[in-house]
Regions:
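Outer-membrane beta-barrel translocator/receptor signature
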Residues: 202, 217-224, 232-286, 310-313
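Face-selective signature of the C-terminal outer-membrane beta-barrel domain
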Residues: 316-338, 364-548, 572, 576, ...
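Outer-membrane beta-barrel signature, preferentially recognizing the C-terminal barrel domain
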Residues: 509-513, 587-636, 640, 659-673, ...
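Short, acidic, small-residue-rich periplasmic hinge/interaction motif at the N-terminus
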Residues: 35-39, 47-51, 82-88, 100-142, ...
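N-terminal periplasmic accessory domains that precede
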Residues: 102-107, 149-151, 190-193, 207, ...
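Outer membrane beta-barrel strand-and-loop segments of large Gram-negative receptors
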Residues: 303, 455-459, 502-509, 633-692, ...
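Short acidic/polar hinge/loop motifs at secondary-structure boundaries
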Residues: 155, 182-209
Length: 838
C-alpha cells in the first residue's frame, strides 16, 4: 500500500511539474498578478477595474492571497486595467497590443505620504469566505476590545468549548495554531494562554474545517488559526493595550492582561517584537454527588471551594531579511512562561439512603488539596523562501523548527474522616476491637510530575501557478521527531504525621514516549471557468510511535501508514452566491499527556489516567455550504469518527463510589449538523446584527469493554443547539454600544451529558485620536448564567452530578492605542503541526 501511494503521488507531482503554462483558449478571460514593488510578494484585496476608452467600467475583480486576479470581457481593444489598494499608489496598464489572456505582472508602490496624513475609515468585513476556510476579522468585534482570546473564539462560526474547556469546531476536536504554527500547548496550558491573552492583539481567526493536503492530517474537526497583529510598511509601528477586570462571583477579585507589539521595516529587513502578560485569579465552587452501593443506595456529596491563579508571559521575536530579489531568510524565536496554582478545602458527606427517612449522615471527610504547576517553552524557527518566477508565484519554502518544553507540577492532598452516626461509630469500634486498622483514619499523598519534550521538524514546500494563473499546484515533504520524558513520584501520608510533612515514597513511575512522522503531499487547484473551480489533494503519513513504561517494564508501539485524500468543489452561479462541497479524511493522534499512565487525583475518590496503548481515531468529514450576498452562510455537514477518544471513559466502582476517568478508544461517534452565519447585517445605517447558529445531532456507541465496572453496552443519541449573536449601534462622536451573547442547549459528550448554559454581555466604547485609540467598558455574564453542570447516567439512574459555579460575572475596562500603518503579509513559515499535541 505504501508503494502504491508513493507511485501515485510521484505521478501526480511529475505530471503537474511538467505541465507547461499556456494561455487559456477561452477568449473572454484576462488574468494577471499584482505584487508589492519592494518585497515582491503578491498583494491581496487589490481592486482591479477594466475600463473602456470612455472610462466606463467593463469588468472588476479582487486579487486573491497570491495577488492573482481574473477578469472576463468580450474584447480588450482600447481598454485599460486600473489597480488600487489603500496604502499604495494607484497604477494602470493599457491593453493596446495585449491579446486576451495573460496580463504582465503589475507592481504597486507604497504611498508613504498618504499613510502619514490620511485617516483611513474603511474596515474589513467581520467574516470573509475563502476557498477552503472562513476568516473572521476581529477588529470590529466588541468582545475583542476588553475580552480575552476565549471570548473572541466564542464568536467564530461553529466554535464551541467542551466540558473540559477544550476548543471544538462543529462538535469535533481541532488543532489550534498561533500565527500559522501550532500552539505547542497541552489542553490546560492552552486554556490558560487563551484566557490570559488580550483580544485586541488578535488580527483574525481562520476557521479551516477541511484543511487541504498541505496541512497535517491531525485534527478531526480541522484547524483554528489565530493570527496576531503585525506591521507592514516602512518605518516604526506597533500598539499597546491594557485590560482590567473586576469580578464578584463567587468572590470579589480582579484580573488583568496587557500586550505590546513593536515593528520596524527597513529596505531589506522586517523586524517584529511582541509581548503579552497576564494574571488571572479565579474562584470555583463545585458540588458533586455520586451514588454507589447496592441499587445505588448510598450517596457521596463533595463540596469543593477552590481558589487559584493563572499567570504567564509570552515573547515573540521575528526577523525577515531579503538577501536578494528572489530570496528571503527569516527566523522566529518564542518564549512562553506560565504557571498556575490552586488551593481547595473539600468537605464530603456520605449518606446511607437506607436511612434516608431520618436523613442521618453516616460520616464526613474534611479534605485539603493544593497544586502548583510551571511550564517553560522555547521554540525557534529558521525559514528560507526562494521565488523562481514571480509571474507564476513559483516558490520554494524550507522550514526548520525546534521546540523544547519543560513542565513541573506538585500536588498535595490531606483527608481527615469523622464518624457521625452510631452505625459508623460501631463500625469503627468493631474494627479496632478486632485489631484491624481504623477505617476512619486520615490519609493523604504528595505527588510530583516532571515532563520534558523535545521536537525537531523539517518541512519543504513547493508551489506554482499553472494554466495562465487559473490553477495552482503545491507539493512537499515533512519529517518530524519528538521525544517526551515523564517522571512521576507519589509519597504516602498518614496521621499523626504533621500535615505539611511529606511521607514515604510509595510509588514511582517513569514513562518515555517518542514519535517519528514522515509525510508527502500533493495538492492541485483549478478554475475551469468563472463559475466552476475545484481542488484535490492527497497526503500520506508514516508514523513510528514508541512508548516505554519503565517502572512496569512495559513497551508499546506499532508503526502505521495512512493516506488522507481531500476534495473541494466550488460553483459560483453569480456574484451573490457560492456553493461549496468538500470531503476530507483526517485523524486524531493521541496527545502525549493522554498516553501517560500516571494516576492524577481530582479528589480522594476521583482520578484520571492515560493509556499508553491508545490508538489514533479516524474521521470522514463531508460538508456542503452556500454563501449568499457575501455575509450569509448556510452549512450542512456529517462526520463519522471511529476509535473516538476525545473524552475520558468513566470507570465507576458502584461498591466503593470511586470514579476513574481513563483515556480510551471508547467507540464510534457520528454527527450531523446545520449551521447559519450572518455577518454584520445592516438593519439601518447605524445598526448591525451578527448571528451564528448551529444545530447538531450526535450518536455515540461505545465499544464493548470488559474492564468497565459500569456503563457497558452504552449508546446515546442527542440533539443540541448553540449560537452566538451580537448587535451593534453606531452612535455620534465615534461611540458604539453593543450587546452580545452565546448559549447552548444540553449536549452529549461521550458518556457524559453537559447541561445547557448561556451568557449575555454588554459593552460601550469610544474611539478617539483619529481612530488610533479606543476605550471600552464591558459587563460580562450579566445574569450569572454561565455555570457548567455535568451528569453521568447508568440507564435511568443519575449516578453522578456536578455543578460548577465558576467566576465569570464582572466588569472590565480596556484601552488600546495603535501606531504605524497596516497589517503585514505572512509567509509560509513554521512546521510544528505535531507539537500541538504536547
Amino acid at each position: 500500500m505504501r508503494l502504491r501511494f508513493v507511485t501515485i503521488l510521484l505521478m501526480m507531482v511529475s505530471a503537474l511539474a511538467y505541465a507547461a503554462p499556456h494561455h487559456d483558449s477561452d477568449d473572454r478571460k484576462l488574468t494577471g498578478r499584482v505584487t508589492d514593488s519592494e518585497s515582491g510578494r503578491g498583494l491581496e484585496f487589490v481592486t482591479v477595474a477594466l475600463r473602456n476608452s470612455s472610462a466606463d467600467l467593463v469588468a472588476a475583480a479582487t486579487t486573491d492571497s497570491t495577488g492573482v486576479y481574473v477578469l472576463t470581457a468580450s474584447s480588450a481593444a482600447g481598454c485599460r486595467v486600473e489597480f488600487s489598494l489603500v496604502g499604495y499608489k494607484d497604477a494602470s496598464v493599457s491593453l493596446d497590443g495585449v491579446t486576451i489572456g495573460e496580463i504582465p505582472t503589475v507592481s504597486l508602490v507604497p504611498d508613504t505620504q498618504m499613510l502619514q496624513s490620511a485617516k483611513v475609515v474603511g474596515k474589513r468585513p467581520l467574516l470573509e469566505h475563502r476557498f477552503d476556510k472562513i476568516v473572521m476579522n476581529v477588529s470590529e468585534l466588541a468582545a475583542a476590545k476588553t475580552g480575552n482570546a476565549t471570548d473572541v473564539l466564542r464568536a467564530a462560526p461553529g466554535v464551541t468549548f467542551d466540558k473540559d474547556g477544550n476548543i471544538q469546531l462543529n462538535g469535533k476536536s481541532v488543532t489550534v495554531w498561533l500565527d500559522d504554527r501550532p500552539s505547542n500547548m497541552s489542553g490546560k496550558e492552552l486554556q490558560a494562554y487563551l484566557k490570559g491573552s488580550s483580544g485586541v492583539a488578535i488580527d483574525k481567526i481562520e476557521v479551516i474545517s477541511s484543511p487541504s493536503s498541505k496541512y497535517d492530517a491531525e485534527g478531526a474537526g480541522g484547524i483554528i488559526n489565530i493570527k496576531t497583529k503585525r506591521g507592514l510598511l516602512h518605518g516604526f509601528n506597533g500598539s499597546v493595550s491594557g485590560n482590567g477586570q473586576l469580578k464578584w462571583e463567587p468572590k470579589v477579585h480582579g484580573t488583568g492582561d496587557g500586550s505590546v507589539r513593536l515593528g520596524y521595516k527597513g529596505d531589506v529587513t522586517n523586524t517584529n517584537l511582541s509581548y503579552n502578560g497576564y494574571i488571572y485569579p479565579y474562584y470555583s465552587d463545585v458540588t458533586e454527588d455520586k451514588r454507589y452501593g447496592d441499587s445505588y443506595g448510598s450517596l457521596l456529596r463533595t463540596v469543593n471551594e477552590s481558589k487559584g491563579r493563572w499567570a504567564g508571559h509570552q515573547i515573540m521575536l521575528s526577523e525577515d531579511v531579503r538577501i536578494s530579489e528572489s530570496d528571503i531568510l527569516g527566523a522566529i524565536a518564542k518564549v512562553n512562561l506560565n504557571g498556575s496554582g490552586y488551593n481547595a478545602p473539600t468537605t464530603a458527606m456520605i449518606d446511607d439512603f437506607r436511612k434516608f427517612d431520618d436523613a442521618e449522615p453516616y460520616s464526613s471527610m474534611a479534605s485539603r488539596a493544593s497544586e502548583t504547576t510551571g511550564t517553560r517553552q522555547y521554540s525557534a524557527n529558521i525559514n528560507y523562501t526562494h521565488t523562481f518566477d514571480e509571474s507564476l508565484s513559483q516558490e520554494l519554502a524550507v522550514n526548520a523548527d525546534y521546540n523544547h518544553t519543560r513542565s513541573d507540577a506538585s500536588n498535595l492532598q490531606r483527608n481527615l474522616y469523622t464518624a457521625l452516626s452510631p452505625a459508623a461509630q460501631a463500625e469503627r469500634d468493631a474494627s479496632l476491637a478486632a485489631g484491624l486498622a481504623d477505617p476512619f483514619l486520615g490519609n493523604g499523598l504528595n505527588d510530583s510530575t516532571f515532563r520534558r519534550a523535545n521536537i525537531w521538524s523539517l518541512k519543504v514546500d513547493f508551489a506554482q501557478n499553472l494554466w495562465s494563473n487559473t490553477g495552482r499546484v503545491e507539493a512537499g515533504a515533512k519529517a518530524a521527531v519528538s521525544i517526551t520524558d515523564n517522571r512521576y513520584s507519589t509519597y504516602k501520608w498518614t496521621p499523626p504525621t504533621p500535615e505539611e510533612q511529606v511521607g514515604e515514597l510509595s510509588a514511582r513511575n517513569d514513562f518515555t514516549y517518542s514519535e517519528q512522522i514522515y509525510a508527502l503531499y500533493a495538492n492541485l487547484s483549478k478554475a475551469f471557468s468563472e463559475k466552476w473551480n475545484a481542488q484535490v489533494g492527497l497526503r500520506g503519513e508514516y508514523t513510528i510511535p514508541r512508548g516505554d513504561w519503565k517502572s512496569e517494564n512495559r513497551r508499546s508501539g506499532k508503526n502505521y501508514f495512512d493516506i488522507f485524500p481531500n476534495v473541494f468543489l466550488n460553483w459560483t452561479p453569480s456574484q451573490k452566491a457560492i456553493l461549496s462541497l468538500n470531503y476530507s479524511y483526517r485523524l486524531n493522534r493521541p496527545k502525549y499527556w493522554q498516553l501517560n499512565p500516571f494516576r492524577r487525583y481530582v479528589n480522594p475518590t476521583t482520578w484520571s489516567v492515560g493509556d499508553p496503548e491508545l490508538k489514533p481515531s479516524y474521521s470522514h468529514n463531508l460538508t456542503l455550504s452556500t454563501v449568499f450576498f457575501s455575509n450569509l452562510t448556510l452549512t450542512a455537514g456529517y462526520s463519522h469518527q471511529k476509535n473516538y477518544s476525545e473524552h475520558q471513559v468513566p470507570n465507576y466502582d458502584k461498591s466503593l463510589g470511586t470514579l476513574e476517568y481513563r483515556f480510551s478508544n471508547a467507540g464510534v461517534q457520528q454527527m450531523a449538523y446545520l449551521a447559519l452565519a450572518l455577518s454584520e447585517q445592516n438593519i439601518t445605517k447605524w445598526w448591525t446584527v451578527t448571528l451564528n447558529a448551529n444545530y447538531m445531532f450526535t450518536h455515540f456507541r461505545a465499544y464493548p469493554n470488559p474492564n468497565l465496572l459500569a456503563f457497558n453496552d452504552y449508546s446515546k443519541s442527542s440533539q443540541s443547539f448553540n449560537g452566538y449573536a451580537s448587535t451593534t449601534f453606531y452612535l455620534p462622536k465615534e461611540f458604539k454600544f453593543s450587546i452580545d451573547g452565546w448559549g447552548m442547549t444540553p449536549v452529549t459528550a461521550g458518556y457524559f451529558t453537559v447541561a445547557g448554559m448561556w451568557s449575555l454581555n454588554a459593552s460601550f466604547s469610544k474611539s478617539f485620536l483619529d481612530g488610533r485609540a479606543n476605550l471600552t467598558l464591558r459587563v460580562n455574564d450579566i445574569f450569572k448564567s454561565m455555570n457548567q453542570n455535568l451528569s453521568l447516567w447508568d440507564g435511568d439512574v443519575e449516578t453522578m452530578k456536578m455543578i460548577d459555579l465558576t467566576s465569570n460575572r464582572g466588569i472590565s475596562l480596556g484601552f488600546t492605542y495603535s501606531f504605524g500603518k497596516t497589517v503585514a503579509p505572512r509567509r509560509n513559515v513554521g512546521s510544528f503541526e505535531e507539537s500541538g499535541r504536547l
